[in-house]
């Protein structure tokens, strides 16, 4: 008797490895859009989780941004139930004025998934992001001038979220759904000429990278480009983790009992470590991470290394940094 299709086996092994990292009694929820990647994840989880003694279910988020979205969500939930997963649909309201259509939909989706995790007893939410998604993320952030932490791409685990498929190609997951007889939904917003557009009429950034940039790079450099970009993300994540640890040590050394920072200690540190420490200090002081930009960190750094009596620095969240008597107070 032959075994499962090689791609089915690879998907199951990826989920099995992820589940082995979790606390023994912790359940999992598959975030399923109805697309090929998340349906493959649902199929692999439905097979592996019961055999690992774990409760497993599925959550389908309906963003209600496209005509027929309720039907798409219902069909995805039905396919999850057919695999043996208890599934439910959660409809969210997306304010596209907040961060554009992609960002607003993402924020609403993750908030709904976090709520579903809490309702399921802090279940881990499994996301179907692939090696190709990781490559697209690296390119997108590189084009925006991001630093090492952002270029490290999507982490395998963060908070309640986990991504077991980050080292599997999208094409292999398409083979999974074909092999197990599932019918994926083709999201029109993923297409370069899809209905969702930027304000200037151009394609959404990720759609452009998926449909134009990565294919052009692959044609010019060969088929290994996505894997190479994903590998770069892994290497950068190790570097970023080390720099973050050094920055935490620097903050601990520089911080006084009143919370102010010793400027001399900060100035003696390598710039990459010092700027990370200053960013962390601003976050600790209450500046929202999403609003704290490179320009703010540069201004804080100037208070340390280029001080000539200038005024303090206004930070997001109504915070302010000032230098006095060799100390930096946020």
Curated annotation (Swiss-Prot):
Gene3D superfamilies membership: 1.20.59.20, HUPs (3.40.50.620)
Q: Which GO terms describe its cellular component?
A: cytoplasm
Compartments reported by the entry: Cytoplasm
Q: Which GO terms describe its molecular function?
A: ATP binding; tRNA(Ile)-lysidine synthase activity
Which keywords does this chain's UniProt record carry? ATP-binding, Cytoplasm, Ligase, Nucleotide-binding, tRNA processing
Per its UniProt entry, what is the enzyme's top EC class, as one word?
ligase
Gene Ontology biological-process entries: tRNA modification
Binding-site residues for ATP, renumbered to this chain = 33-38
Reactions listed under catalytic activity: cytidine(34) in tRNA(Ile2) + L-lysine + ATP = lysidine(34) in tRNA(Ile2) + AMP + diphosphate + H(+)
Q: Name one Pfam family in it.
A: ATP_bind_3
- What EC number(s) has UniProt assigned to this enzyme? 6.3.4.19
Q: Identify the InterPro entries for this entry.
A: Rossmann-like_a/b/a_fold, TilS/TtcA_N, tRNA_Ile_lys_synt, tRNA_Ile_lys_synt_N, tRNA_Ile_lys_synt_subst-bd
What's the domain remark here? The N-terminal region contains the highly conserved SGGXDS motif, predicted to be a P-loop motif involved in ATP binding.
Relate the protein's function as given in its record: Ligates lysine onto the cytidine present at position 34 of the AUA codon-specific tRNA(Ile) that contains the anticodon CAU, in an ATP-dependent manner. Cytidine is converted to lysidine, thus changing the amino acid specificity of the tRNA from methionine to isoleucine.
Please report which protein family the annotation says this sequence is part of.
Answer: Belongs to the tRNA(Ile)-lysidine synthase family.
The protein, known as = tRNA(Ile)-lysidine synthase
Organism source for this protein? Answer: Beutenbergia cavernae (strain ATCC BAA-8 / DSM 12333 / CCUG 43141 / JCM 11478 / NBRC 16432 / NCIMB 13614 / HKI 0122)
Instruction: Provide the organism lineage as a comma list.
Output: Bacteria, Bacillati, Actinomycetota, Actinomycetes, Micrococcales
Q: Which gene encodes it?
A: tilS
